[in-house]
Amino acid sequence: MRISRWNMTGALAVWAFTSTADAQTARTAPDPIESHRAAGKNAAGGRDNTPDFYGLVTAICVAPLNAPARPDAPAPRMDPNRASAYLEPKKAFDDLYWMGTPSRSTWALTTRDGIILYDTQGVYDAEAIIVGGLKKLGLDPAKVKYVIVSHAHADQVGGARLMQERYGARIVMGAGDWDMVDESVNGFPNGKPKRDIVATDGMKITLGDRTVAIYLMPGHTPGTIGGVFQVHDRGKPLTVVYSGGTEFNFVNDVPHFDTYLASVRTFAGIAAAAGATVIIGNQSQFDGAALKLRTLADRRPGEAHPLDVGAAAVARYFKIEDECGQAVRLKLLAQNQ
């Protein structure tokens, strides 16, 4: 079979053009990891381009991709410098109160028949932050009937035993995290809480005139739980979604990220269906609670509550988790190839 010089030249020209185009495409095609990171960062912007979730995007979209490996041995536990670590407790809404530090939150939902507490700080913090904080707010710690522990890391479950033993509060936690508590060797220097209420998906905790709907969202820990409930702002009802666990400080492999991402997407749908306009959690640097609540003293009539960010912003919070989680997942896949 004869191939004319023209045909050969044309074929070579087409090959050269195609190769050049392919190379150009390779050079200009967006990096999928960076695309997800960019989408996560873009989702952090709030009203007037104010980055209302800057702390969240910094923690999970920047640090995880660049952070050094964790040391084999954990740092020793230390009683914190209370003068700098503990913040004044605040009345956040008509019936929701905040206590905590610049990085950790405990929330108290008041009802007709007592208090539902969300998360309990660390072992060394609970007495001062929770017991002392409730008293400063004019609330009685003995009226805490339920403690919902979003996940069993030491800075959320540390005060559960105190509330259980001293005040008889019922402790609610996911099954996987009760197992974590039971199996812990040295995570509870003052003793562990006794296994109590095991959270199930869709469970409702009702006290007086309030109900908290609980949802399983494994990922951050095996038994992480989130919640949906109602509060009031100057008499106006608002729906709150409580994000139970955010950071990627679990085993960094693809299956764990698949679990995390599935939970984020499910819980985002639950929040949207509930019409939630307030998103809070146990890490005050992620929802901005510690800073935002300081502005309440200067809030003017008709001005929006700093934590009532709107349904679109609540969706953006979950988008940050989703996009940044996908970025790290893709990086893990690339490393395994």
Spans of features found by a protein language model:
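Sec/Tat signal peptide C-region and signal peptidase I cleavage site
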Residues: 19-23
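Conserved beta-strand hairpin/beta-sheet module of binuclear metal-dependent hydrolase folds
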Residues: 82-137, 141, 226-247
